[in-house]
């Protein structure tokens, strides 16, 4: 089991991490191009330094037309109709109970009793699921994979799956699209685009971007040849469903055929047919909502986390699921191996990384998830003291988010900061991983930014063929792209010494997406038996749920 005591010391203060070479992280005094041996392999990406000053905080005022008219007293039934549309049942009962005329006394009394009963039921439901009492903004901030979502200028970052293009959601609710081959930066704005929580590019499409907003989902269709920097709102398609707000997570199927959405207040995952603007629910009756969705790269499974101490894994053939309860808290973050045979996840309140394997392969038309009985602990991130050139430094704690690169050889973990501890800022841990023939997790190093900068989001480039490319959003507004140069263990394609890409094996393609899927040796015991071996296990037992 890997622990923080095995990590090399962090870089000296004032140094920033530039790239990885020979399994070591190279630092410098500032963000600069790699040495001459590497400059030929450097990809052309825009350098972003976004500050909070020019970004206006999104307004929270009501921009409706109600305040433009002179107030006059309406009849009670008209007021109830308007309140039903704006507030719902609670507002109607409150209006009738507090009306002074036009209502019989027994109607007022009955409405008062019904209002008290509804409030009691609401408080009971809120005690079971405390997150339902939060405002929409607080809900998004609570379950966002970015640290300090409420006040950071970089809220969401999403790479395009096939090209050097990415989208960034900013504090002012605008979304900017950057392309390495173009100087034009479209800025997407819409009156419904508020509190953006997730961005998702449609696979196998050059121009379709899904945006998760407070009240809906916007599907932007951008013309790659357009010279406009402000696409009109007519380029956006609106998807919405009652009770499915705020939307906190989006996930396209790897084939691009389906779009999944999740909301912490809706117990059902919504599967959207974008062309007809209709959705089909994937319901369950426990968990109080869905916070995050993550489709496995092979398209066979979907991880669905909840606000409660349970998470589910769905299979995408017959749409059945299995559930794994956790011991202390909800699933905080997770990531899939490239072949979908392994899930790494963390639990809120625990400084541990768990591994859950899926050795069973189901045939065509058979609905089964095939997960192991229990999860094993593969890394202990408990706080420890590390000797540095500047003295002792405490490192460790809980993980906030975690990403696995498409080659399956690098894992980045964004650790939570501790405001009460001196220098208790968030840090990024980098691991070397191997998923076949046996799973390995080894320390690589600690990624550091400019003085005073704290990491807020991390993600890997989906198709970087020279190793891995880690993109980091910092609290200063800078988006840094850190290349991790290494030779792929299964299909060596890049040699930093030669400075050129090597040819893949016969029959293999030049892209990661064209390579055969990794495989794992499955045990000879029953499918539900835990994998053999001495690692400690915790009882995360699945229970079938259709």
Swiss-Prot record:
InterPro entries: Aladin, WD40/YVTN_repeat-like_dom_sf, WD40_repeat_CS, WD40_rpt. SMART domains: WD40 (SM00320). It is found in: Nucleus, Nuclear pore complex; Cytoplasm, Cytoskeleton, Spindle pole; Nucleus envelope. The keyword Protein transport applies. Residues 529-539 have a biased composition (Pro residues). One of its GO terms (cellular component) is nuclear pore. Widely expressed. Particularly abundant in cerebellum, corpus callosum, adrenal gland, pituitary gland, gastrointestinal structures and fetal lung. The modification N-acetylcysteine is found at residue 2. The modification Phosphoserine is found at residues 33, 495, 511, 522, 525, 541. Keywords: Acetylation, Cytoplasm, Cytoskeleton, Disease variant, mRNA transport, Nuclear pore complex, Nucleus, Phosphoprotein, Protein transport, Repeat, Translocation, Transport, WD repeat. Its main location: nucleus. A motif (Microbody targeting signal) lies at residues 544-546. Pfam families: Beta-prop_Aladin (PF25460). One of its GO terms (biological process) is mRNA transport. WD repeats lie at residues 142-180, 183-222, 234-274, 280-316, 324-380, 386-433, 442-482. Residues 500-546 are annotated as: Disordered. Gene3D superfamilies: YVTN repeat-like/Quinoprotein amine dehydrogenase (2.130.10.10). The keyword Transport applies. PANTHER family: ALADIN, ALADIN/ADRACALIN/AAAS. Plays a role in the normal development of the peripheral and central nervous system. Required for the correct localization of aurora kinase AURKA and the microtubule minus end-binding protein NUMA1 as well as a subset of AURKA targets which ensures proper spindle formation and timely chromosome alignment. Interacts with NDC1, the interaction is required for nuclear pore localization. Interacts with the inactive form aurora kinase AURKA. Interacts with PGRMC2. It is linked to Achalasia-addisonianism-alacrima syndrome: An autosomal recessive disorder characterized by adreno-corticotropic hormone (ACTH)-resistant adrenal failure, achalasia of the esophageal cardia and alacrima. The syndrome is associated with variable and progressive neurological impairment involving the central, peripheral, and autonomic nervous system. Other features such as palmoplantar hyperkeratosis, short stature, facial dysmorphy and osteoporosis may also be present. This is Aladin. It comes from Homo sapiens (Human).
């Amino acid at each position: 089991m890997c622990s923080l005591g095995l990590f090399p010391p962090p870089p000296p203060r004032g140094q920033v991490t530039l790239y990885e070479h020979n399994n070591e992280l190279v630092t410098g005094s500032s963000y600069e191009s790699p040495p001459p041996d590497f400059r030929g392999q450097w990809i052309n990406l825009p350098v972003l330094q976004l500050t909070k000053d020019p970004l206006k905080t999104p307004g929270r005022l009501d921009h409706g037309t109600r305040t433009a008219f002179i107030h006059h007293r309406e009849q009670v039934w008209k007021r109830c109709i308007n309140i039903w549309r704006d507030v719902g049942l609670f507002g109607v009962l409150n209006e009738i109970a507090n009306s002074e005329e036009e209502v019989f006394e027994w109607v007022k009394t009955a409405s008062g009793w019904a209002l008290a009963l509804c409030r009691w039921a609401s408080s009971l439901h809120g005690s079971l699921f405390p997150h339902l009492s939060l405002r929409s903004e607080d809900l998004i901030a609570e379950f966002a994979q970015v640290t300090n979502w409420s006040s950071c200028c970089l809220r969401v970052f999403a790479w395009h799956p096939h090209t050097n293009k990415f989208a960034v959601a900013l504090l002012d609710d605008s979304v900017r699209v950057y392309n390495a081959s173009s100087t034009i930066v479209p800025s997407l704005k819409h009156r419904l685009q508020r509190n953006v929580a997730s961005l998702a590019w449609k696979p196998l499409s050059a121009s379709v971007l899904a945006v998760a907003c407070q009240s809906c989902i916007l599907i932007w269709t951008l013309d790659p040849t357009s010279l406009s920097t402000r696409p009109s709102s007519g380029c956006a398609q609106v998807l919405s469903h009652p009770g499915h707000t705020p939307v906190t997570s989006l996930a396209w199927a790897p084939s691009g055929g389906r779009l999944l959405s999740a909301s912490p207040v809706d117990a059902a995952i919504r599967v959207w047919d974008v062309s007809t603007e209709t959705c089909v629910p994937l319901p369950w009756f426990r968990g109080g909502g869905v916070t995050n969705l993550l489709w496995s790269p092979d398209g066979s499974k979907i991880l669905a986390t909840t606000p409660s101490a349970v998470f589910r894994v769905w299979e995408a053939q017959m749409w059945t699921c299995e559930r794994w309860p956790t011991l202390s808290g909800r699933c905080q973050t997770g990531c899939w191996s490239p072949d979908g045979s392994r899930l790494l996840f963390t639990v809120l309140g625990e400084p541990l990384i768990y591994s859950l394997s899926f050795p069973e392969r189901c045939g065509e038309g058979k609905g089964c998830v095939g997960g192991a009985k229990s999860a094993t602990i593969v890394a202990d991130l408990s706080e420890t003291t590390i000797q540095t050139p500047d003295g002792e430094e405490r490192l460790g704690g809980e993980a906030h988010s975690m990403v696995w690169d498409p080659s399956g050889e690098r894992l980045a973990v964004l650790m939570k900061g501790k405001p009460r501890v001196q220098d208790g800022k968030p840090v990024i841990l980098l691991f070397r991983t191997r998923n076949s023939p046996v799973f390995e997790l080894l320390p690589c190093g600690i990624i550091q930014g400019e003085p005073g900068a704290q990491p807020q989001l991390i993600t890997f480039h989906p198709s970087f063929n020279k190793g891995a490319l880690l993109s980091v959003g910092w609290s200063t507004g800078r988006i840094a792209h850190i290349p991790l140069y290494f030779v792929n263990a299964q299909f060596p394609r890049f040699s930093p010494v030669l400075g050129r890409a090597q040819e893949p094996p016969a029959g293999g393609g030049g892209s990661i997406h064209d390579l055969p899927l990794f495989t794992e040796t499955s045990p000879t015991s029953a499918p539900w038996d835990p994998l053999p071996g001495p690692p400690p296990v915790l009882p995360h037992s699945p229970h079938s749920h259709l």
